Amino acid sequence: MDIRFVLPSEVEQLARNVVTSFPSKTPAALLQNMEGELHRPDEGRYLGCFDDDGTLLGSILMMDFTLNVRGVMMPMGAAAYVSANFLHKKERVACTLLKVLMRYYAKQGTPIGCLHPFNPAFYANMGYGYCNENYLYQPKPSAIRSYGDKSGLSYARPEDRQEILDFYRAYAARTHGATVHHYMDPHRIFDMPYVVVCRRDGRLTGYFTFDFVAVDHYTDMYHDLLVPEMVYED
């Protein structure tokens, strides 16, 4: 067994492992950028577990974040797309990779590790615990109050990009539990189809992103309005 970073020539094995592990949750952009990431990592580095024949048994995306812990910005090592070869499930490949990842970050002096668990009990056995809660609100549109004045709202322009990023990172610097990632932050915000900003006297005071999600009512007239991110200061 060999544990090392995945090579660009092994991208097909890596893509197959990720898709068979997350068949409905693998973003198309992740697959499109995968080979480029193996040449020049931006989002993170893919660590792989190989057998003696060079078959990829499992993989994990190692990502470097900065996390606000009660006002102190700390480095954090994150695990994403923990994937096992479909023909090698239940062989503790994922467990082995996570242990290697945790030892790596411990040697780097990184005090915090995180991941988004498919099964919290599975990762609890490795020392992971719960962090801040993630709330999902589902109000009816009729329950959203209108204050009449929307003059400060506008769709974000390309020239607003850096100002919005600076606004988010200032928010992250004062908010416990917020994270910063040089690659993920702009993609999380600007890969959304709609970004709206709020200005007061010309100064940015907030922004949110949104999209329309189809609801299966056998007609294209029904949609949910999804707002994954809303950051504001007033």
Q: In which residue ranges do the predicted regions lie?
A:
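Conserved active-site alpha-helix within GNAT-family acetyltransferase domains
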Residues: 107-111, 117-135
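Conserved acetyl-CoA-binding loop-helix of GNAT-fold acetyltransferases
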Residues: 81-84, 90-103, 233-234
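Amide-forming acyltransferase catalytic core, primarily the GNAT-like/NAT-type
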Residues: 134-233
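Extreme N-terminal starter segment of soluble prokaryotic enzymes
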Residues: 1-3
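Active-site rim helix/loop that mediates acceptor-substrate recognition in acyltransferases
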Residues: 22-68, 173-195
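Conserved beta-strand in the GNAT
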Residues: 48, 55-65, 76-78, 83, ...
